[in-house]
């Protein structure tokens, strides 16, 4: 099995804080709030629900905004310091299914009802993607080193099982761009079409969209035939009902975490790196703009103001010799975007950094792949 590591990939920018419970009343149900908070108690048919998430989300601000907190051992929660807006609020947690969304505004005490999952399969739909990804079974250690496509199907460069796993998970491989184990990747959606086998379905899906050529080429690092068989076996076992192990709910200080999210780049973009301060002195740029680069998907620096919730962009100038690296045509249409060329860029930017004066620096180069 693949070892599980906790990580987050997405278009949202997350800022994480810790709350302390010092000085709070320990009476069950007593949740003091300010005028910009929402708080209350989460219960289900089994009683108070500890260690579950309460999510508040709004589209009223210039960019989509969400705040997430965790209930304490008596099911109490506090969503602090919310911008003025109307929020959809619901409960999510291991062993539950999402509760119906309730509309509320800051300054309100709001008790919520959690919904117990009817069965293990329903509960598992909310488990982290990497728990599902851990069900993927890599080639056994005895199959290494690989003997090539004409041998055991594994590349000769894969000297050990860990080399093979590394090639799947590291730079320019699957998990650099994809959250393997999420619902779309752990299933074969009907939108892909009808195929004679799961191997054929995976061979097709890895060629779709603007990066289809790159994905299918990367498959060679895993052994094309064996790689397809391994991914097909993974989704087949999940389709047959195999479930990952049950993750633990947040415990102890994990319940003090407050996550704030802004969708700051758009559904077609891929924000690769971001910076908000000088790492040598994290007091620099307090509450100031947050800067992100869109790497392969655009030629600009994306900037979020966390106070106004507004997003702006600054173009990154390419060199005079740079060419647009977007393909002229999509070989296999994307399930989501069809034949649309969603990425066009001349610059590949990485690793923005902030200096002691709040200036942003980044590495960059001309896009390396040129399509005539």
State the predicted function of each range.
Residues 223-233, 265-281, 285-287, 298, ...:
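Signature of short aromatic-glycine-proline-rich micro-motifs recurring in repeat-based ectodomains
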Residues 205, 247-262, 311-334:
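Beta-propeller fold detector
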Residues 48-49, 78-86, 94:
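Short Pro-Gly-centered beta-turn/loop motif in secreted/extracellular proteins
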Residues 171-182:
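The canonical Cys-X-X-Cys-His
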Residues 59-78:
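Short, acidic Ser/Thr/Gly-rich low-complexity loop/linker segments typical of extracellular
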Residues 18-37, 41-47:
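Beta-strand-rich domain onsets/edges
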Residues 36-38, 44-60, 64, 84, ...:
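Short, ordered, surface-exposed loop/turn motifs in non-cytosolic proteins
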Residues 58-64, 86, 90-107:
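A short, solvent-exposed loop/turn motif at the edges and junctions
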């Amino acid at each position: 099995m693949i070892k599980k590591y906790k990580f987050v990939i997405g278009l949202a920018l997350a800022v994480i804080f810790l709350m302390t419970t010092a000085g709070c009343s320990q009476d069950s149900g007593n949740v003091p709030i300010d005028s910009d908070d929402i708080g209350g108690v989460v219960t289900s048919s089994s009683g108070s629900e500890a260690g579950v998430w309460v999510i508040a989300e709004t589209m009223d601000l210039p960019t989509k905004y969400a705040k997430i907190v965790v209930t304490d051992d008596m099911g109490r929660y506090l969503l602090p310091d919310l911008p003025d807006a109307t929020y959809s609020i619901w409960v999510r947690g291991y062993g539950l299914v999402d509760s119906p969304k309730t509309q509320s505004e800051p300054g309100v005490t709001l008790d919520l009802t959690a919904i117990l999952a009817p069965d293990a399969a329903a509960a598992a739909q909310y488990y982290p993607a990497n728990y599902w990804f851990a069900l993927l079974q890599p080639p056994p250690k005895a199959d290494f080193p690989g003997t090539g496509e004409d041998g055991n199907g594994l590349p000769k460069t894969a000297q050990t099982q860990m080399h093979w796993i590394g090639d799947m998970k590291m730079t320019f491989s699957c998990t650099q761009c994809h959250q393997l184990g999420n619902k779309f990747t752990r299933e074969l959606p009907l939108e892909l079409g009808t195929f004679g086998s799961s191997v054929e379905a995976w061979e097709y899906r890895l060629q779709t969209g603007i990066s289809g050529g790159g994905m299918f080429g990367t498959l060679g690092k895993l052994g094309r035939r064996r790689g397809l068989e391994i991914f097909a076996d993974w989704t087949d076992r999940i389709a047959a009902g195999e479930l990952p192990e049950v993750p633990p709910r947040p415990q102890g200080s994990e319940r003090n975490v407050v996550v704030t999210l802004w969708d700051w780049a758009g559904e077609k973009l891929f924000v690769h790196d971001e910076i908000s301060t000088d790492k040598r002195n994290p007091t620099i740029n307090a509450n100031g703009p947050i800067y992100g680069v869109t790497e392969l998907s655009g030629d600009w620096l994306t900037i979020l103001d966390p106070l106004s919730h507004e997003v702006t962009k600054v173009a990154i100038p390419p060199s005079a010799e740079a060419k647009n690296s977007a393909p002229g045509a999509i070989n296999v249409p994307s399930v989501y975007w069809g034949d649309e060329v969603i990425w066009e860029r001349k610059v590949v930017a990485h690793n923005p950094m902030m200096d002691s004066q709040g200036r942003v620096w980044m590495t960059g180069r001309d896009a390396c792949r040129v399509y005539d």
